[in-house]
Amino acid sequence: MANDNIPDAPDDDDLEQLVGEWLTIPDLGERLGLRLSDVRQLLVDRQLLGARVGPRNVMSVPSKFVDEAGPLPGLPGTFTVLGDSRMSDPEILRWLFTPDATLPVAGAPIDALLAGFKTEVRRRAMEAAF
């Protein structure tokens, strides 16, 4: 489903390049010290979002979504707000990784989340719903 609230959204083929660094499910499990089933459960519970990328179409998660402690705490609520606006998972990923010069930090909404601007990102996510 296309969403006109995503500025200059790239095609699905460009999602892999837009996000940049991805972690496969096994790599993510190793990084977090979790079993593969536990990593998959994070996706089912929408603590993380992923996409099939690469030449082998492997389910992967953007590396910016996790730190040493696990999934970034601001992500699930942001996923919910964007999902409530009827964005698909690929559209949510595009929105989070598309650069926005009007943010309080340089980069994309994911960079603003990483810098601690969760409220600002969620406000913009709510605006994208309308």
Model-derived features: positions:
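Non-transmembrane "mature" sequence context
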Residues: 1-130
